[in-house]
């Protein structure tokens, strides 16, 4: 039975691909008490996401379910090496190391595993596609009143825990049911007036804390300071007031909920999103596909920056390699970076203003700064480069432009003695992209890209990426990494099952 279960594939292909040496930095080099094998811990965390179980259920399953023991190579152990705190302590170690050294060990491990698994699945990195997905933070979108109240109440509670004296007028923040009284039951003032009252209470508490300096090390104090800085302003007379909506600086990056201070806000596809954004790179073979790399940032991170980061980290690709993504990943710099790595970048949507297609036949110098020839074959008398607008300013003879068949589409500026035309290399590249989008080859690339849309859908439906039970970018990124590994395991399982089915059918025939 084990030979036909998921445990066989995991034990033979996934478990051996887990590189324990990556995590050696977490442990002492001195001989000491033996620790739980790291590959067992990492394997258990992958199975946790793949089978949608909790930490406690994994521990129980390893004690009583032979499939888990077989998958993690622990059948010969007299006692299973995982306890109720093993997984949480390992995650804490990894996060502590990342905070101190800015190195994501889980990402390194998952990417290396994907490389080994892709070799078995005969998937090469010459056909890639990229997509991003919004990952919801496990927080509520608080109103401004709720946000101020929560931050003030949190500071009051930590002051009470440390035995500090809370002013009488602010003492009610630590009383039971005060939140409901202030937010829902106090109807004699509107929400803005109540927010101003809480803001003034915050000012009083900050002054009390500043006088002693005993709370500078607390997140509650720091978050309240941040909130006052982002949402209030001090006028010339020294009084503090709430900022108007247009006065808020970087509204996408302000504090949304003290439970997750790193979560950001973004409008995308007509919806409001609080949290983070994941980016996945999928490599496609003849029979299957695999996520070979991923990234995870605050959701204000641009898609074209994800592409730029990915290309900068990669070495040269083999001839004929390409990567396909939607229009948000486009950009002249990204195309240049891809070309430097022998990779063709194809973006399937066109974003921004569309230039006239006649610009596709304009010829520039190699550095893209000077126009050499226009669509009609005319050579400018004089040409300058405008670094401020990153464009070329060319001057042509009046007689050439007056008789040009493309005059209306080009729309140059006629001066007294000559004609001025401003055009950038970016416009030429975008015009060439428009022409290319009408070809049959581009149509095939667009169909190829559509397949990557399944990844965000799977991560949401099967792996519950929007319900990660922790807060903060580093913590949620750790869970995201294991979900990617679980997704790859499922793809591997489907691949091995297809091979077994093919072999069975061949034998029957």
Pin down the residues of each PLM region.
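Basic, low-complexity segments
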Residues: 1-30
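Short basic-aromatic helix/loop recognition motifs at nucleic-acid
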Residues: 31-35
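Double-stranded DNA-binding cores of transcription factors and transposases
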Residues: 38-39
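Alpha-helical support elements that line or immediately flank enzyme active sites
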Residues: 42-52
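Anion-binding and metal-coordination hotspots
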Residues: 54-57, 62, 76, 80, ...
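Short, basic interhelical loop/turn and adjoining N-cap
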Residues: 65-83
């Amino acid at each position: 039975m084990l030979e036909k279960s998921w445990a066989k594939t995991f034990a033979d292909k996934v478990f051996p691909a887990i590189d324990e040496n990556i995590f050696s930095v977490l442990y002492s080099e001195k001989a000491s008490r033996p620790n739980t094998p790291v590959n067992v811990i990492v394997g258990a965390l992958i199975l946790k996401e793949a089978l949608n179980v909790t930490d406690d259920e994994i521990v129980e399953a390893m004690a009583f379910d032979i499939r888990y023991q077989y998958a993690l190579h622990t059948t010969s152990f007299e006692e299973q090496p995982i306890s109720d705190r093993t997984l949480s302590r390992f995650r804490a170690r990894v996060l502590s190391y990342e905070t101190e050294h800015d190195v994501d060990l889980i990402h390194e491990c998952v990417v290396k595993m994907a490389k080994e698994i892709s070799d078995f699945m005969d998937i090469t990195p010459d056909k890639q596609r990229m997509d991003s997905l919004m990952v919801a933070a496990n927080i509520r979108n608080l109103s401004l009143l709720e946000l101020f109240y929560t931050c003030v109440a949190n500071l009051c509670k930590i002051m009470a825990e440390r035995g500090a004296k809370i002013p009488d007028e602010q003492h009610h923040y630590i009383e039971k049911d005060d939140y409901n009284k202030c937010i829902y039951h106090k109807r004699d003032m509107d929400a803005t007036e109540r927010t101003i009252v809480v803001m003034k209470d915050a000012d009083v508490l900050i002054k009390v804390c500043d006088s002693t300096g005993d709370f500078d090390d607390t997140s509650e104090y720091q978050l309240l300071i941040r909130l006052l800085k982002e949402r209030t302003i001090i006028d010339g007379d020294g009084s503090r007031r709430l900022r108007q909506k247009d006065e808020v600086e970087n509204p996408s990056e302000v504090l949304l909920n003290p439970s997750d201070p790193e979560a950001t806000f973004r409008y995308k596809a007509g919806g409001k999103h609080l949290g983070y954004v994941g980016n996945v790179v999928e490599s496609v073979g003849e029979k299957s596909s695999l996520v070979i790399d991923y990234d995870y940032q605050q959701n204000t991170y641009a898609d074209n920056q994800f592409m730029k980061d990915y290309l900068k980290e990669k070495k040269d690709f083999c001839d004929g390699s390409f990567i396909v993504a939607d229009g948000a990943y486009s950009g002249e710099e990204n195309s240049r970076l891809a070309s430097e790595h022998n990779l063709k970048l194809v973006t399937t949507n066109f974003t921004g203003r569309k230039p006239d297609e006649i610009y596709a036949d304009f010829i520039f110098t190699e550095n893209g700064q000077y126009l050499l020839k226009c669509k009609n074959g005319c050579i400018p008398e004089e040409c300058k480069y405008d670094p401020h607008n990153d464009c070329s300013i060319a001057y042509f003879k009046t007689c050439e432009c007056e008789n040009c068949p493309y005059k209306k589409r080009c729309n140059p500026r006629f001066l007294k003695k000559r004609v001025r035309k401003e055009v950038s290399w970016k416009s030429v590249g975008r015009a060439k992209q428009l022409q290319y989008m009408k070809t049959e080859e581009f149509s095939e690339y667009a169909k190829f890209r559509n397949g990557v849309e399944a990844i965000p859908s799977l991560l949401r439906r099967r792996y519950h990426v929007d319900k990660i039970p922790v807060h903060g970018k580093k913590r949620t990124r750790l869970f995201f990494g294991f979900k990617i590994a679980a997704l790859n395991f499922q793809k591997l399982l489907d691949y091995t099952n297809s091979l077994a089915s093919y072999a069975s059918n061949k034998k029957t025939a």
